[in-house]
Curated annotation (Swiss-Prot):
<feature type="modified residue" description="N6-acetyllysine">
    <location>
        <position position="53"/>
    </location>
</feature>
<dbReference type="GO" id="GO:0033574">
    <property type="term" value="P:response to testosterone"/>
</dbReference>
<dbReference type="InterPro" id="IPR025835">
    <property type="entry name" value="Thiopurine_S-MeTrfase"/>
</dbReference>
<dbReference type="GO" id="GO:0006805">
    <property type="term" value="P:xenobiotic metabolic process"/>
</dbReference>
<dbReference type="Pfam" id="PF05724">
    <property type="entry name" value="TPMT"/>
</dbReference>
<dbReference type="GO" id="GO:0008119">
    <property type="term" value="F:thiopurine S-methyltransferase activity"/>
</dbReference>
<dbReference type="GO" id="GO:0005737">
    <property type="term" value="C:cytoplasm"/>
</dbReference>
<comment type="similarity">
    <text>Belongs to the class I-like SAM-binding methyltransferase superfamily. TPMT family.</text>
</comment>
<keyword id="KW-0007">Acetylation</keyword>
<protein>
    <recommendedName>
        <fullName>Thiopurine S-methyltransferase</fullName>
        <ecNumber>2.1.1.67</ecNumber>
    </recommendedName>
</protein>
<keyword id="KW-0808">Transferase</keyword>
<comment type="subunit">
    <text>Monomer.</text>
</comment>
<feature type="binding site">
    <location>
        <position position="35"/>
    </location>
    <ligand>
        <name>substrate</name>
    </ligand>
</feature>
<feature type="binding site">
    <location>
        <begin position="129"/>
        <end position="130"/>
    </location>
    <ligand>
        <name>S-adenosyl-L-methionine</name>
    </ligand>
</feature>
<keyword id="KW-0963">Cytoplasm</keyword>
<feature type="binding site">
    <location>
        <position position="64"/>
    </location>
    <ligand>
        <name>S-adenosyl-L-methionine</name>
    </ligand>
</feature>
<feature type="binding site">
    <location>
        <position position="147"/>
    </location>
    <ligand>
        <name>S-adenosyl-L-methionine</name>
    </ligand>
</feature>
Length: 240
């Protein structure tokens, strides 16, 4: 369903906005985590079967995973989940809130990084920057669920981010991606506005891109930012 969302002419206005890893860790410390969705994402629920295509034993990647409960949805269905998150608080809260026992160990490839693994063995969460992750050799993935990652990455880092994502995709992949549309002159981000033209630049040469759905996602907290519209657009990216 198309809502006829127009591209904003001032898409470049956020391009120099930068948040550091410390800024993101501080959000967890100060509990500024409105981006976390307690019930999981409704668009993923709706398109879950389409995304999985009835396949079993998939490897699923969650970039900038936080404590997303959707990770357990996949694990409970027998899939292997790997996430990356800079905040150790977020990772520990995921395991605590989902009542999962886990182990933790340092990552020798990345100074100061750790990997947390569920005792069942099918959830592994890496506590490090996603830009350091390639050194951990985590393998390739059949599915990627990206609800709050591309829209959180500094606009100047999107090319690097896309390169990492593309390097993690296995033949026959499905990459499900949510981007946001709002007036970027009213809110500095994050989350950032990602126009369609930017998506095509990042992924269009390697991926087929299909917009599955556009939804009006305006909440009161968005209005406090000064924006008067806020749309989510769900894309499915597949192999060309």
């Amino acid at each position: 369903m198309s809502l006829g969302i127009k591209e904003h002419p001032d898409a470049e206005v956020q391009k120099n906005r930068v948040l550091t890893l410390d800024d993101w860790q501080d959000k967890w410390v100060t509990r500024h985590i409105a981006f976390h969705q307690e019930q999981g994402h409704q668009l993923l629920k709706k398109h879950f079967d389409t995304f999985l295509k009835g396949q079993s034993g998939l490897r699923v990647f969650f970039p900038l995973c936080g404590k997303a409960i959707e990770m357990k949805w996949f694990a409970d269905r027998g899939h292997t989940v790997v996430g990356v998150e800079i905040s150790e608080i977020g990772i520990r809260e995921f395991f605590a809130e989902q009542n999962l026992s886990y182990t933790e160990e340092p990552l020798t490839e990345i100074a100061g990084a750790k990997v947390f693994k569920s005792s069942s063995g099918n959830i592994s969460l890496y506590c490090c920057s996603i830009f350091d992750l390639p050194r951990a050799n985590i393998g390739k993935f059949d599915r990627i669920w990206d609800r709050g990652a591309l829209v959180a990455v500094n606009p100047g880092d999107r090319d690097r981010y896309a390169d990492i994502i593309l390097s993690l995709l296995r033949k026959g992949y499905h990459y499900l991606l949510v981007v946001l549309s709002y007036d970027p002159t009213k809110h500095t981000g994050p989350p950032f506005y990602v126009p369609d033209a930017e998506l095509k630049k990042l992924f269009g040469t390697k991926c087929n891109m299909q917009c599955l759905e556009e939804v009006d996602a305006l909440e009161e907290r968005h209005k406090t930012w000064g924006v008067d519209y806020f749309f989510e657009k769900l894309y499915l990216l597949t192999e060309k």
